[in-house]
């Protein structure tokens, strides 16, 4: 009798445990991570700390544009704008269960894959495999502390050359004797820190280096102008090297006619889905302007690139994204020049981006709607769709 009672008791415990596990599983399925517009995430990746505090201007942007998260809330992209250690910590402080959050190891790999260093190596491999003369990027190079450039920046005597300011104006300045190897010295260059977004951490730098000139060829040049320019070039590059471990240098594409991107999502089973194209506008410094909210047919008309080449690039990106540990939204920024050439990968955004938002907004509202996505503010930031464009307005 006692044995039978014990068996029935154990059977009851098994059923209760099974029911509890089933209910817990169902609860986890119903739970989701709150959507969050944390546009400072790229800076948080650079800082690589759990307690990251963005600059006040960026804090204001995130607060003013918080309602943007409603665009992807309830979709398969529900969650943060981007992942980092700081994002994970923020969710912990919000009370999100640890089992719903990614591991630190996964976040470390996402940080590496999000770096422009990775994009630089990715482009080199892409060009070597596809071998298409219409593809640009052969001058895109990564420079770190192991590069001879590090010594050149810190020990070499100044050399006179030419710099290009953000307006594209050339001026003579002390730029430092720096050897960029295969990068042609007759062209302007754009310098980028490993992690940044919307034009931050990006500037146009010096050209026309002449190692044989070690004195000022123009004695009438204002020495203060020289000092400022040297600071804005060499010291910024030294800052990139010391704070983020390096920087990317590439040709400055003065003949650029279009910014566009390919948007993907990597599923947890590592299948990759091409979501579509996005077309956007940036300022000369790389700052975000707007995205077109239009049909794919209209966006392809704007891009106007050989379809076969685009399909080859899509296939390449899908194959290589599937080989990473990452899962989630991806945007690969590209550009087109006046002769029809395209840069296949300026950077890889392993996060939500304005291009994917534009795709979602087209699905929700079409191309002709005027929509205030965030509250109208007398001072601060506002997001809206107007005249077929997704824009972020700023009033200081």
Each predicted region: which residue ranges?
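Conserved N-proximal alpha/beta basic substrate-recognition cap immediately N-terminal to
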Residues: 29, 42, 58-159, 164-166, ...
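Intrinsic-disorder-associated, low-complexity terminal segments enriched in Asp/Asn/His/Tyr and depleted
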Residues: 29, 165, 174, 179, ...
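Compositionally biased, intrinsically disordered low-complexity segments enriched in Pro/Arg/Gln/His
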Residues: 23-24, 158, 167-171, 177
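ATP-dependent carboxylate/phosphate-activation module, predominantly the ATP-grasp catalytic core
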Residues: 264-316, 349-375
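Phosphate-binding site of ATP-dependent enzymes
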Residues: 231-286, 335-344, 353
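ATP-grasp fold ATP-binding core
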Residues: 184-205, 238-255, 332, 347
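A long amphipathic alpha-helix within ATP-dependent nucleotide-binding catalytic cores
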Residues: 242-252, 285-340, 374, 378-388, ...
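Glycine-rich phosphate-binding loop of ATP-grasp-fold ATP-dependent ligases
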Residues: 188-209, 226-230, 259-261, 284-300
């Amino acid at each position: 009798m006692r044995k039978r009672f014990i068996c029935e008791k154990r059977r009851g415990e098994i059923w209760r445990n099974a029911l509890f596990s089933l209910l817990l599983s169902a609860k986890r399925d119903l739970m989701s991570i709150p959507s969050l517009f944390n546009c400072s995430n790229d800076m948080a990746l650079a800082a690589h700390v759990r307690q990251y505090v963005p600059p006040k201007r960026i804090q204001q942007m995130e607060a003013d544009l918080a309602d943007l998260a409603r665009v992807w809330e309830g979709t398969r992209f529900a969650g943060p704008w981007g992942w980092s250690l700081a994002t994970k910590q923020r969710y912990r402080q919000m009370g999100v269960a640890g089992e719903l959050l990614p591991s630190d190891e996964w976040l470390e790999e996402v940080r590496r894959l999000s770096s422009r260093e990775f994009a630089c190596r990715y482009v080199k491999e892409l060009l070597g495999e596809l071998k298409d003369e219409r593809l640009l990027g052969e001058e895109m190079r990564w420079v770190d502390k192991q590069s001879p450039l590090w010594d050149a920046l810190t020990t070499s005597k100044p050399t006179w050359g030419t710099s290009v300011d953000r307006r594209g104006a050339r001026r003579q300045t002390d730029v430092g004797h720096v050897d960029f190897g295969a990068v042609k010295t007759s062209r302007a260059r754009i310098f980028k820190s490993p992690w940044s977004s919307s034009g931050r951490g990006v500037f146009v730098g010096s050209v026309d280096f002449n190692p044989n000139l070690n004195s000022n060829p123009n004695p009438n040049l204002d020495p203060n102008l020289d000092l400022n320019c040297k600071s804005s070039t060499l010291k910024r590059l030294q800052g990139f090297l010391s704070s983020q471990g390096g920087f990317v240098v590439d040709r400055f594409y003065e003949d650029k006619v279009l910014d566009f991107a390919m948007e993907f999502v990597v599923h947890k089973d590592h299948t990759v889905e091409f979501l579509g194209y996005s077309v956007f506008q940036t300022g000369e410094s790389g700052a975000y302007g707007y995205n077109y909210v239009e049909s794919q047919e209209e966006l392809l008309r704007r891009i106007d690139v050989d379809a076969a080449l685009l399909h080859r690039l899509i296939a390449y990106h899908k194959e290589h994204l599937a080989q990473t540990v990452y899962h989630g939204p991806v945007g690969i920024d590209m550009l087109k020049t006046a002769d029809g050439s395209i840069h296949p990968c300026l950077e890889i955004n392993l996060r939500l981006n304005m291009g994917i938002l534009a795709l979602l907004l087209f699905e929700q509202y079409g191309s002709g709607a005027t929509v205030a996505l965030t509250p109208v503010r007398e001072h601060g930031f506002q997001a809206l769709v107007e005249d077929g464009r997704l824009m972020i307005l700023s009033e200081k």
